[in-house]
Amino acid sequence: MAINLDGAYLTIRESLRHMPVQEWGRVLAVSSIAGVRGLKGAHAYSASKHGVIGMIRALCADHAKLPVTFNAICPGYVDTDIIDRNTQSISERAHISQEEARALMVDLNPHGRLITADEVASAALWICGPGSDSFDGQAMEISGGQP
């Protein structure tokens, strides 16, 4: 909770000190699909990521007069080193191999694959770009349609 929610809050709070003097700005927080849908067995993680989304929406309402947008990205399972740690944890708890645990994550994505870091980065670049002025107070899912 302290890293996911408090860390995001403290970082955003400091960045807001500089926003009013600029002509426009973007605040983008990283949440998770778990913050949108909840994740079985990960109550605190899901709650902290849901808190990030709530904070972003409240900041959007509070600072609507600033030329700043507030959004969150909510990736599903992204093919990174974190997946290896997750598959190890799942395999130990479920008494299955790490390959089977990874396959479970892949199966959650209707595209039949993990999300790539480049896909997340592309979404973040669009949200932070000059053509996204009306995209504000949103939690963008980057999950391949993961339920």
Segments predicted by a language model, with ranges:
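Short, flexible catalytic-loop segment of classical short-chain dehydrogenase/reductase
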Residues: 70, 75-85, 89
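Residue(s) in the substrate-gating loop at a strand-loop-helix junction
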Residues: 32
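Catalytic Tyr-x(3-8)-Lys segment
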Residues: 88-118
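Short, small/polar-rich loop/turn modules that mediate ligand/substrate recognition or access, typified
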Residues: 64, 69, 135-137
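Catalytic Tyr-X3-Lys loop
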Residues: 1-10, 24, 28, 52
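Active-site loop-to-helix junction immediately N-terminal to the catalytic Tyr of the SDR YXXXK motif
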Residues: 38-46, 58
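Active-site helix of classical SDR
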Residues: 12, 48, 56
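C-terminal substrate-recognition "lid" of short-chain dehydrogenase/reductases
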Residues: 10-12, 16, 24, 111-142
